[in-house]
Amino acid sequence: MERENVVVEKRGGIGFLILNRPEVDNRLSQDFLTEISHTLDELNVDDEIRLIVIKGAGKNFCVGVDVAEILGLDEVAGRNFFVSLSEMYKTLHRVDKVTIAMVQGYATAAGMGVASSCDLVVASEDVQFGATGVRVGLFCMTASGVLLPRVVGSQKALELALTGDLIDGKEAERFGIVNMVVPRERLESAAVELAGKILSRNPVSIVMGKRNFYACAEMGFDEGLDYSAEMYGVLAATKGAKEGMRAFLEKRKLSYK
């Protein structure tokens, strides 16, 4: 598909999906949301890449939905807009490849949702996160109801959504919203370094492990253990897993790059 608001770059097995509306701080229009979803689907089946990094062009990662567009919508059109937002979150959550959000500046409202929907988050020291919908007369429904409770717990998620307060990188790291905080000039190198560690592992184990992780999160204790045992059996019988185990027993280095 032709892209207007998204740029894709491929380097060393990494697909960079760049949110490219810097003139409006990467605000998410409905067309933009659809474009992100389609691009994620394309990257998920692209054999050239094994991992996806999402970054925002300009000084801010993403400041949420395009409020000017929403203002002109009636109830039906507004619902359709937010269905597109939810579908983008679902697409981001279900891709087989590991996703890393590379976040700088403001990541607010749906922008915080994009980051929280990724598997891992690397942020710059100047980052500001917030479920800020309430500041403009809206409410971060998906962030407070679905995305953030999985990370920070229900009470903190609701507090953030009710107040619209901003939190900095260190506080976000303390709450588990981000995996690491680095100086802004090191942001991309830190994300690439983290990606490199993952890319050095058995690609089949990464895909199956991610799938197992999220599946078990939706299951009860016994069901999760049973499912994991089945997945483990399948994984251990694969060629890549057997080669990894042989290398370990033979005390030799192995790279899956």
Residue ranges and their predicted role:
Residues 31, 35, 84, 91, ...:
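Charged catalytic carboxylate motif
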